[in-house]
Amino acid sequence: MIVKKISKLNEKELDIILNRNKTNISGILPTVSEILENVQKNGDNALKEYTKKFDGVDIDNFKVSTEEIDKAYDKIDSKVVESLEKAYENIREFHEIQFKNLNEWEIDKKGIKAGQIIRPVEKAGCYVPGGRAFYPSTVLMTVTPAKVAGVKEVIVTSPPNGTEGNPATLVASDIAKADGIYKIGGAQAIGALAYGTKSIPKVDIIVGPGNIFVTAAKKLVYGEVSIDFPAGPSEVLIMCDESSNEEYVAMDFLAQAEHDPNASCIITVTSEKKAEKIKERILMEIKTAKRTEIIEKSILNSAIVIGSIDECIELSNSYAPEHLEIMTKNPREVLKSIENAGSIFLGNYAPVPVGDYASGTNHVLPTSACAKMYSGLSVETFIKKPTVQELTKEGLLGISDIVTTLAEAEGLFNHSEAVKRRLN
């Protein structure tokens, strides 16, 4: 772990921090491309082949039955079900307000009406990771905004748990009102959603995080379908000053570090003394933490850097973190200068896990500095905004000279004539 003043970071150290473990998919593109081509050509037969190869099971029917969903409720703790239901309510409420703040509008000027309307995509596919662990919270985060946006058909794909679906994933899908759940994962699931098979419908957009093969597949099918954004290892930047609580900072650091050996955790702090206290607390907490094998690897991707609050803000904006915690004396004042972040957590009582599960905001967020150009998953992800225009003859006359002049300048004489014929 680097512990150093921002002003003293050399070019290599700064590059390690800013260009953290970005997902390099070039080496697996031929393999993923072959999988996608096979799924496109052979449909369900290809899916069965890859499920046997990668998951070690034979599945004839990928769609989860109503009976299987009903049984799933009996297989998980009732408190987990209750927590999923409560989390769903918060997530749904947040995204409903988000949807209400999307506006259709129209201007009316001299015989020209021009505006924008809002329409959802027709079908959405939500990929939910599996493998080492299953993530029912990701079901809520992907399905809920799609349903709120008005998507007619929202389906979930997730790797099988043996020959069945993971019970918590099935329950979460039912709570979020998914229209279909399929026991299929990996690049082959992305291919099924992009091209459609006999059993799995083709969708218009694919959302949700996944491993490097899923990320590569999403990039390759983009254009055939829309996607949310590329996803990489999870990351957090925690901004601190003298007022910050070292215990809270250390625990939030470990909460991120336990995600993945490639997770990145950066702490910016305004004093060297505070930086040392935070480092000591982190090392102390690691001794009794769970998932230490993962934490000890991800800590190699981490740093504590010291600088003025302005230097810390500048570094944060360059880093563009997936999660940004501002644990300073006046977090809302710092917020005014933040340009790039996936989701922002203010003050001592807003750790990243609340956004991961229950505050209502979405946890599917851009990583690897993609927050410079992407927002997190939202109802807008599933929305199209067609523009509309209606002109009177007087309105057309008022702009006809502009249209005909520019059309003819570009050599598009029939464009010009289409206007002139209406005015003759």
Curated annotation (Swiss-Prot):
Record: residues binding Zn(2+): Q256, H259, D356, H415
PROSITE patterns linked: HISOL_DEHYDROGENASE
4Fe-4S as UniProt keyword: no
Pathway(s) served: Amino-acid biosynthesis; L-histidine biosynthesis; L-histidine from 5-phospho-alpha-D-ribose 1-diphosphate: step 9/9
Cellular-component GO terms for this entry: cytoplasm
InterPro entries, sorted: Ald_DH/histidinol_DH, Histidinol_DH_CS, Histidinol_DH_monofunct, Hstdl_DH
Comment on bound cofactor: Binds 1 zinc ion per subunit.
Obligatory cofactor(s): Zn(2+)
Disulfide bonds listed in the record: none
GO MF: histidinol dehydrogenase activity; NAD binding; zinc ion binding
Active site positions: E322, H323
Binding site for NAD(+): Y127, Q188, N211
SUPFAM superfamilies: ALDH-like
Name of the protein this chain belongs to: Histidinol dehydrogenase
Source species: Methanococcus maripaludis (strain DSM 14266 / JCM 13030 / NBRC 101832 / S2 / LL)
Lineage, uppermost ranks: Archaea, Methanobacteriati, Methanobacteriota, Methanomada group, Methanococci
